[in-house]
């Protein structure tokens, strides 16, 4: 029910080939990734929204923000969202007017790259937009849903993915820690749980506590472990009980480690010594070596296959060299 908009056009406002602020666009991307990762670690379910897709497939129908066949009740604008497309802004205005919820961690001040007083006023209006402070810890209660609820597993190593099906829900749990187990419970709608064994392909029953039409399911995941469950809307007969949880025993390593290839392979060598007209440039990355070689032979921007698009044969017809034009030596 939650759509998080990607700040793509906002980042492009700061990016140029010779950027006067070369770190701003990169920092914005890192901050946005940290934001959505934090949501995932706290089991917030959301989709990512592209403004370009909204342009062709987005609409506002009542208090629902519609993208294709999906409809959302909440739209989130991250702190990095400084610009919105005009089409996106129009959708957000109509969505808010019908009671749709918008959570903004920043105040977009630009529409289609131009400063907009209308946008500033809209996103600052508490009657239309729920303001959230990007400088404070995320208030995860804003994203609570009656459909599914987790306890607070220690360490925030748990990630999950859920899909609604015709007769129930598919729930995948994964422990991202390589050293610590993750234990806890999850509560969601359903009447019976089944374990889908991804190793054997078997389907077995899985113990759960039922209260009305809701199930509380306990999980206990080994480091790097996972669990795939199916939660049925109605009870099913004939499901064998799940096998007992295996106990892992640490086995100390004995002897040295020997590795050998199963078959011949390719080893990429990224560095070389470049020789141009008798001058040697040692220990260059292959990208830099190619750039220097092309520049030496008249391509001012460097490697044309990295910096330009060829029109007809304008690049290949400049290949008049009979001896290659350079020497590259690779060290093993």
Predicted regions and their residues:
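Carbohydrate-binding surfaces of carbohydrate-active enzymes
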Residues: 1-332
